[in-house]
Every structure is written in structure tokens, then in C-alpha cells.
Amino acid sequence: MSVRTKVLGLVDVMMRVPPVMVIDEILKMDMGMQSWLYPDKDKASGALATPTEAPAVPSGQDPFTSIKELFSHMTTSAQSVLEQSIEKASEAAKTHGMLSSGFNSLMNELSKDQTLADVLSTTTVKFVLCVFAFLSAACIFMLWTRHLVMVYMFLTSLGLTFLSYWSNVSALALTERSPSMVEDLMSLNTTRLLDSGGVVMSLAPHLMAQWFMGMLFAYIHLGPRFEHVQRSMPIIFASPILLAMLPLPAKVVQHLPVVAVFTPIILTKITLMQSAMEASRTVYNGYQYAMNFVSNFGLSALIENEWQRLNVPNVLRVFWTIRLIQGGYALATTESDEPLDLMTATQKLLVDGCETMTAVLGMTGVISMFCHYIGRGFQWYLLTYDDEEKSLGTVSAVLFYILALQTGLTSLSPDKRFIRLCRNLCLLMTALLHFLHNIVSPILMSLSAARNPSRKRHVRALSVCAFLVVLSVSLLYHLWSQQSISTWLLAVTAFSVEVVVKVLVSLATYTLFLLDARRQFFWEKLDDYLYYVRAFGNSVEFCFGILLFINGAWILIFESAQNATGGGIRAIMMCIHAYFNIWCEARAGWSVFMKRRSAVHKISALPEATPAQLQAFDDVCAICYQEMYSAKITRCRHFFHGVCLRKWLYVQDRCPLCHEIMMYTDKADENAPEAEPAPAAQAEQPMRIYPRDDANNAAAQRRSPERAPVEASEQAPATSSSSAAATIGAEAVSAIVESAAAVGEARSLVSVASSSSATHRISASGSSDSSYMTASAQSPPPTATSAAAVATAAASNTTHMFRMSQDQQ
């Protein structure tokens, strides 16, 4: 990325910060609602803000003092009377019911109360203005960069106009108490003119500033650009100061600033009227673009696209950093008798840093950046460059924001807010330990399984595991020694112990793989040991998941009554936790257990190979390519390790080499006498091969494939009367001959399979599958070889086509 692109990106981020600051200030005012609607937010604020409280500003120095006093007077005067009336009405409703005469009379008094009407009207006006400002700031924040530049140019030109007016008023105030400058110039009174404290030296900065503001306004304003007006704009801005040098009456001089800003105001109004339709068209086009994008790609794709376009994380980080610097500067410049305590200042900054939802979002962005670089640091230490850790910052940010919403962080009093913030950070730290374990665990497995000889990588991975265990144990020791038992402490304990168990399971698996790598012979019990270790870890995680669900239910029922929003979010998160971390995990664990149990049962049914058979076999296992000192014999007379065969049975029941059914079934045992007719009966009856497909079975039952060549040869003379029929018949005869050869091949293969299955039935005490070849009087078996199935299907289809040609003839 070039330097120019980085600079433009930084400028775009900085331009989007002011709308966020406006939204933050509106949220500080609680959207214009009265402060008595949120009483808990201002309680105990004195204990936290007393040492750093700013001194009272004199009313003459604050231009908004009268407005603040008006709203505060209205609030304080109406609050006590209104609260008393509401309390009386609520008590009457509780005592006598809402339909009682006392309650109705109190409600009538409240409806006629002028104080209540004034408060409601003032609150309504403030709320409407705050909503309008909130929506305007949000729209400005979401504008494209080109439109954002135009908005800032308009606001800058408007600001220059008011700044010029204020500067002219201040400059003219200096000339009122001084002699005429024209007389000094005409008399060449250099002493007064060059006096450092004189009026000339005082007006010089104002004159230069007016000239510069006039040139800047002429350059950036969006109104009509007339050539003469553009050139005379600096003179128009500086005209009040220049005319004040003349001996004019005081009444005329007082109105000069208003006359000077008349031209810029006219140009600004023209710009506003011309841009009104353009602004509404831009908003409408943005709405249409969003609707089309959602209909084509979905809402999530729109949010992701706009998130990247607006560069929201960096905007929030810059906003929160500016907010933190502003708060730190206010604390540093506050005059106080006591010295500034670092701990108190940090506490005050952190509390103010999560005062509103926008501030919480900014803190979330900063925490996300810290977690991202922590993950990058551990990756660098572990000598790995996997891209999975890129989600570490995003997941930690989402987790912190959900915790803030669940606990109602912004609605708490400052002291409670600081305690809750520290608890949320502890929970986030335990989650971060889980993420770090997810990074180091695959590295441990790869190092042990690949037999990596690099000791440096082994030592680094093991040191990270030791760090996770030590940090978790230290955190638990500190919390249990300093805090009393609570639901939050139980949650942190569960997460920390789960981290320790996960690390121990990873180390045990790593140790088993290392021991297996050092052994000279095949370790058949390795799979069992790994299964037991991982089953222990998964069982502990499942138990902690149930414990956390019960803990969350307790918090939801007994501790979240005053926070409806947080309670709703907690309920949703509990449902997600119950489904993914409890139900899905239990179902997956039960499935693995049943597969393993079924595989063990099937393996135990197979015969064990004797040393003589292994010596005669004298080969390796076809699955793991290791020497066989013990083996299981399948129904198709293949030798495999019992452990390897068990892993294979997790996937399918067919032999890895010949794809035959490996296991013996009791159903075949019952049908064994019927499946093996006498040799004389087999000689008298034609043999049939039944394919797997039901449609092909029906075709095979309709016409025997072995008789097809004979019938074709008998009907061949009849097909010579028509050339078209002869062509079809010739093709059919050739296809049938080929299919008959395939059937003969399949019959030989099936006869070998039947002899092999007979041997297996003897060795396994009659527990085998049904025979693949039966007499014509017997019902077709459920399975057959794939070669026989293909050959039979081809023969039956070709015979059917040949019969159709004969019917046409």
C-alpha cells in the first residue's frame, strides 16, 4: 500500500469521527429525556468524580449558561412535585386498584397539572431535536467520501462566516475606547501607531485573519462563483475593520459586522437551497442501493460491505482515543489541592470511556486491536503463520460488546460500572486464553505426529502451555482470595479450569504421540489411550457447559430483573449456548461412542489370526503399512490390524481391498442350508446372478440372461425380412454376446466368492452373509458383486431391446 493511499485512508477516517462525536454527545444527554428517568446513572458519581471535579465556571464566561440554568431550573422545580404525584397515584393503584375513585382522581389531577404539561412539552421538543440531530449525524457518517467532502466544505464556509462575524465584533470593541487611527496616520504619530499595546497592533491579527478567512471562503464555498465577488471576498470580510478606522458614528460602526456577513450568508443560503434536492436525492439513491444489494446478496453481505467501506473499527478507535485524550487533558488541567492520583485518574478515564454505547463501541475497537496483536505476538513466538488468528480480534470484540450489553454497562453508576468493567475484562481474558490454546494445540499435534526434530519449536510450544496453566491458576488463586463467591466468580472459575483441562489433554496427546514415535513396534493400544484422554477432556467441557448454563439461568432469573435489554440478550445467548455447546456436543459425543461401540462389537466377531497364519501371510497391514504381530481375518480372507480395521469401520463396512461386506450376520446363518443346495440340484437348475438394483432385478426375473443368446440365435432368421430390423438385430446380437461373456466372467468370480464364504462360515461357526448365487427357486439375496450386477443389467437391457425389435418386425 502506497503512502498516498494510507494518507487518504487516514483523512477519510478522520472525517467520519466528528459525526460519531455528535452521536456520543446526544447519547450523553439521554436523547433529551429528563435525568430523573435514569436515577441510578447519577448515583455515587460524587465518590468517583470528587477529586477530579472541575471548578464552577463563572456565568459570564460561559455563553450557554443561561440555557443550562433554564433547563436545570425547569427540571429541579418540576421533579419533586411530579414525583410526589406519581408516587401517590401508584400507591392508590396498589391499594385500591386501577379502577378505584382515588386513582382516577389523582390521574385527573395529573392530566390538569401545568407543571407536568410544561415538562412533557419541553421533553418532547428536546427529544425531537435530539432524534433529528442523531439521524443527521448518522446519515453524514454513512456518506460516500465525495459527498462527505462537500458536507464539510459547506459546514466550513458556514463556520468561517460566523467566525468572521465574531472576530469583527471583537476588533470593533477595541476601537471604541481608542482615538481615531486616521488622525494618528495623518499626524504620523508613530509612537502610538507602533505601540505594542496600542490599537494598531491589536487590530493587525484580526485584519490578517479576516483576509485569510475571506480567501478561504472564496475557495471552498459551493455557491455561485461570480468573478468580481470572488476577488472582493477578502475585502468584504475585512471591511468592518477598515471602515472602523474612519471617523464614523458609533451606531454605524456597530452594524458593520452584520453588513460584512450579509454576502457570505446569501451565498450559503443559495448553496443550501440548491443542495436540498441533491441531498434528498442522495439519501433516496442510498436507500435504493441498499435495497437492491439486500435483494441480490443478502443483509449480512450489505453490512459486511458497508463495514469495510466506512472503515468502522478504525473510526471507533480514533474516536475513543480522542475521547480519552480529551478526558486526560481535562484531568491534567483541573486545579485541585490534592495531587493527581494515577489509579484514580485511570479509573475515571475507564469509567468515562464506557459511558455511552458509542464509547463502548470505541473501547471494543481498541480491545479488538490489542487482542489481535497479542495473537500475532504468540504466532511470532510459536514460529507459525496461520491466518486463523485473524479472527481473534473480531471474536474478542464481539464477546466484549455482548458482555457490555448483558450487564447494562452504560446504565450503571460510575463505581458499579468500574467493577462491572473489570469483571467483563476478566471474562474476556479467560476467553483469550482459550483462543491462545486453540493456536498452540494444532502446533503440538503437528510437532508430535511429524516427529519434528527442532527442539526450539517444541520448547516454545511447551512454554506457551505452561504460561496458560500458570496464568489460569494464578488468576483463580487471586480471585478466590480477594472476592466472595458469586455467579461471576463461578463463571470465571469454570472458564479457567476448562483452559487448564484443555492444556493437560493437549499435553497428554502430545506425550502419547512422542512415545509412539520412539517405539520400534506398532502400538495397538495408542488409539484406545487417545480416545480415553480426549473423552475425559470432552466430558469435562460438557459438564462445565451445563454448569455455565445453570449459572446463566440463575443470573437471568434473579439478577437481571432491572436490566430488560441485558436480560433479553442473555436469554438469546443462553439458547445459543444450550444448542451448540450442550445439545450438539452431546449428540456428537453419543454418535462417536455408538460408532466405537459398534466397531468394537464387529471386530470382536471376527476371528483372530493365529501365528501360523500370520507367518504364512508374511505381509504388512494394507491400511497402516505396519508389521502385523496380531491381526483380524475378514470374511473375504484379508488380514488387517484390529485397531486399523476399527477405524475403517467408523466409515464403512466394506473391505478396503475388495469392497466386499467384511462382517458375518446371523441372518445369513439362518439361510445357510437354503443357500447351499445339493450339487445335483445345482446341476439341474440354472444359476442366476441377482444385481443390487431393484429395476434390474425385475428385468432379470422377467427374462433369464443365460437364455438370451439361444433365443437370439433362434429368432435371428426371422429378422432378415426388413433391413432396419436386421440392423437392430445385428447390433443386439453383438451386444448380447458381449454381455453373455461378461456374465460368464461374473459367474466364475461369484463361484470363487461362494467358496470363500463357505470357508468363512465354517471358521466363524455359521455367522455369514447369504450366498451370492442361489438356485432359481430361491428368493434373490440382498447383495451381489458389482461385476455381476453390471453384467446382468446390461444383458437384461439388451435382451429387452432385442425383443422390441422382434415385435416391430
From Swiss-Prot:
Its domain of life?
Answer: Eukaryota
| Gene Ontology annotations for the cellular component aspect, listed alphabetically | Derlin-1 retrotranslocation complex; endomembrane system; endoplasmic reticulum
Mind listing the UniProt keywords for this protein, alphabetically? Endoplasmic reticulum, Membrane, Metal-binding, Transmembrane, Transmembrane helix, Zinc, Zinc-finger
Q: Where are the zinc fingers (RING-type)?
A: 621-659
Q: Does the keyword Endoplasmic reticulum apply?
A: yes
Which residues does the annotated region (Disordered) include? 696-724, 752-788
Q: Which PANTHER family match?
A: E3 UBIQUITIN-PROTEIN LIGASE RNF139 (PTHR22763:SF163), RING ZINC FINGER PROTEIN (PTHR22763)
Q: What is this protein called?
A: Protein TRC8 homolog
User: Which organism was this protein described from?
Assistant: Drosophila melanogaster (Fruit fly)
UniProt gene name: Trc8
